[in-house]
Regions:
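Rhodanese-like catalytic fold shared by cysteine-dependent sulfurtransferases
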Residues: 1-33, 40-90, 101-157
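Short, surface-exposed ligand- or partner-binding patches at beta-edge/loop junctions that are enriched
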Residues: 94
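Conserved G/P- and acidic residue-centered "switch" motifs that form tight phosphate/ATP-binding loops
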Residues: 98
Length: 157
């Protein structure tokens, strides 16, 4: 499983936002983007957020590669190459439960903060509970919180 890096800056705090708040923001703000950091099998078999009323396309970029869950060494570069940084204010990161996306948001925020021309102009935010949410008492996801549980638009291929 992907672990946090020892070289993370200690002074960066990643805020969290509930899925319904994130969707509302993405529906009205053209400077906000949703970045889904799950794996290709998760997108294909579990589903993915649907951009029905969102102002921008969803960015799909694997934080780690299935099945070994090794970190994508090009993750940050792939994300930044898909964005016009002059037009971004908020980047929302989502994964299955909110864990990987937190590390992904932290990693991108750290990189952005190192670039003086955009430092403190773009905020990386974690989608609390992720796409599927926490495990229920019977060890199943999607029954207590998360994007799908909140009734937000999603698709499955």
């Amino acid at each position: 499983m992907v672990q946090s890096s020892d070289n993370f800056e200690k002074n960066i705090i990643i805020e969290e936002s509930l899925p319904s708040s994130v969707y509302s923001e993405l529906s009205i703000d053209h400077t906000s983007y949703l970045i889904d950091v799950r794996t290709k099998p998760e997108w294909n078999f579990v589903g993915y957020p649907y951009i029905k009323n969102m102002k921008n396309d969803i960015i799909f970029c694997e934080w780690a590669f299935y099945p070994l869950m090794q970190k994508n060494p090009y993750f940050e570069d792939e994300i930044l190459s898909k964005l016009n940084l002059d037009c971004c204010k908020k980047l929302y990161f989502i994964c299955r439960s909110g864990s990987r996306s937190h590390y992904a948001a932290y990693s991108v925020q750290t990189l952005l903060n190192q670039q003086q021309n955009i430092k403190n102009t773009i905020k990386c935010i974690n989608v609390k509970f992720g796409f599927e949410g926490d495990l229920s008492e019977d060890k199943r996801r999607g029954f207590s919180n998360g994007w799908k549980f909140s009734g937000l638009p999603w698709k499955q291929s």
